[in-house]
Regions:
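ABC-family P-loop ATPase nucleotide-binding domain
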Residues: 1-3
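Transmembrane alpha-helical interface segments in multi-pass membrane proteins
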Residues: 6-11, 15, 19-30, 34-42, ...
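Alpha-helical membrane-interface segments at transmembrane helix boundaries
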Residues: 11, 15, 42, 46, ...
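Generic structural signal for small/hydrophobic residues in well-ordered secondary structure
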Residues: 17, 45, 63, 84, ...
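Short aromatic/hydrophobic contact patches that present stacked aromatics
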Residues: 29, 38, 62, 155, ...
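Hydrophobic, regular-secondary-structure patches
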Residues: 42-116, 123-126, 146-147, 164, ...
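Mechanotransmission and gating elements of multispan inner-membrane complexes involved in transport
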Residues: 74, 86-91, 168-170, 177-184, ...
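Hydrophobic secondary-structure segments that place a key small or acidic residue at a functional site
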Residues: 98-99, 110-215, 239
Length: 346
């Protein structure tokens, strides 16, 4: 019996007991579908994060500190980093504190969900690119000025989501309440994502000392301070990072009390984390494929027992052991293949 005949008999066997065949395939269908969904979601998330890092540019440097260290009685503050920018203009072009908070937003009589609030200085907005250090651009209005930050003015720049949701696109000059404190909208950021709640468009920027008074911590849990710096170019980012690390070590006397990362390093770390997570999730999903394969094996063993009469007749007609074994192998392979196709399609 050739392969074509065996394949036709396998399809006939599947058609004869459709429900049994479907239940046998179910493990393969679920397993293949789960692997495809997980890979698709993982790749989508990775691409989304990579696009966000690309918007930031390759010259961004992130600094986080975790305490006073062992060599001094004070932390490094923004004034210390300003000195570095002034001292090494060939490597560094700007620095800003980056304070993360969240606030309940209220406009007139309407309340909105808690929104991410970031405290920054005027240096967060770069005049040469007309955008922020993280790649956002202004749609209208202006960004925070030195006067706004120095005088702790209650002004804010909001994302597209809040501008559309609360103000129907007419936000400039309007006053909103952030956790009970009134702020005047002076700028609106361009849409950068899907403009939904919790997205990159659902943000508010205010002077950093105002955000510190909200008392809700910094960008990363456990950090005392966080700063963003920009190197003059991608080529000088590593050298600029070294300058910053040297200054921090001088104060803390230990690298355990701070962390400095370039945007390229952040992207690499994120990709490594995502790849590890993907491997774990795919391995978990692959277990269902293994279970499906074991299910097909069990059904084939039961089928051999049920079809002893058919096997005997074939042997009496001259079928060899390898022909009968090949028939069951082809049936198992056909069942797996059909289940795999259904898993891909559905």
């Amino acid at each position: 019996m050739n392969f074509t005949q065996s394949f036709k008999l396998a399809l006939k066997s599947l058609k004869t007991s459709k429900m049994r065949a479907f239940l046998t395939m179910l493990g393969i269908i679920i397993g293949v579908g789960a692997v495809i969904v997980i890979l698709s979601l993982g790749n989508g998330m990775t691409n989304m994060m990579n696009s966000q890092f690309e918007k930031m540019g390759s010259n961004l440097i992130q600094v986080m500190t975790y305490g006073r260290g062992t060599g001094g009685t004070r932390d490094v503050d923004v004034e210390d980093l300003y000195e570095l920018v002034d001292k090494y203009p060939q490597y560094l072009t700007g620095v800003t504190p980056y304070v993360s908070a969240s606030a309940k937003v209220r406009y007139q009589t309407d309340d909105y969900a808690r929104t991410s609030v970031y405290g920054v200085s005027e240096a967060f907005f770069k005049e040469d690119t007309k955008g922020t250090m993280q790649g956002e651009t202004l749609a209208e209005g202006r960004f925070l000025s030195y006067i706004d930050v120095d005088r702790h003015q209650n002004v804010c720049v909001i994302g597209d989501y809040l501008a559309q949701t609360a103000f129907r696109g007419d936000a400039l000059g309007k006053t909103i309440s952030l956790s009970g404190v009134p702020y005047t909208v002076i700028g609106v950021l361009s849409k950068s994502g899907d403009s939904s709640e919790g997205s990159a468009d659902d943000v508010i920027y205010i002077p950093y000392e105002n955000a510190q008074r909200m008392g809700t911590g910094t960008m990363m849990m456990g950090t005392d301070e966080m700063f963003l710096l920009t190197a003059t170019s991608r080529d000088t980012a590593s050298a600029a990072k070294g300058i910053v690390e040297k200054r921090l070590y001088k104060t803390y006397q230990s690298s355990d009390y701070y962390m400095v990362m370039t945007s390229a390093e952040m992207m690499d770390a994120m990709n490594t984390m995502m790849n590890t997570m993907m491997i774990v999730l795919v391995a978990i999903a692959a277990i269902s494929l293994l279970v499906g394969g074991i299910g097909i094996m069990n059904i084939m063993l039961v089928s051999v027992t049920e079809r002893t009469r058919e096997i005997g007749i074939r042997k009496s007609l001259g079928a060899k052991q390898k022909d009968i074994r090949g028939q069951f192998v082809i049936e198992a392979g056909t069942t797996s293949a059909v289940g795999g196709v259904l898993g891909i399609v559905f």
